[in-house]
């Protein structure tokens, strides 16, 4: 059975995030500044123990909602709201946790905006908002980013 269009989109985003490595280029000759060690999907109720277990630069993707709108001619437009949570840690006491968080956040943004049509799987994706994860205990830190991903589907191509 072939995967749904939504699943292909989410798998492509997951692949992009997994490719964030210092040895890979975000675009042209701009290399990523971080290495993403672990990517997970639909991980709820994250605990401090989960963060410690998965190590540095752990990224979680959660589907938040979908909104369907009919289009003329029988097509439908679907807007998926995707939550991306990034966790990292300062490995040395002298490391600036804010700088480490910003670096991972930037790399995820570069990976997402590299091709806003995700190899023609969607019409576009757009960053919506970002905020810090509250109640983190040093040396751990995190952020939450939200993206809207819009695609059009017709007939059985759901």
Indicate residue ranges for each PLM-predicted region.
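Conserved short hydrophobic interaction patches
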Residues: 16, 20, 107, 111-118
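Residue-level signal for secondary-structure boundary sites
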Residues: 68-69, 90-94, 153-157
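Oligomerization/assembly interface segments of phage tail-like spikes and tubes
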Residues: 74-91, 140-153
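Extracellular/virion structural assembly segments
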Residues: 75-79, 87-110
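Generic short beta-strand segments
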Residues: 63-67, 87, 130, 148-150
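Exposed beta-sheet edge/beta-hairpin loop segments within beta-rich domains
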Residues: 69-75, 134-139
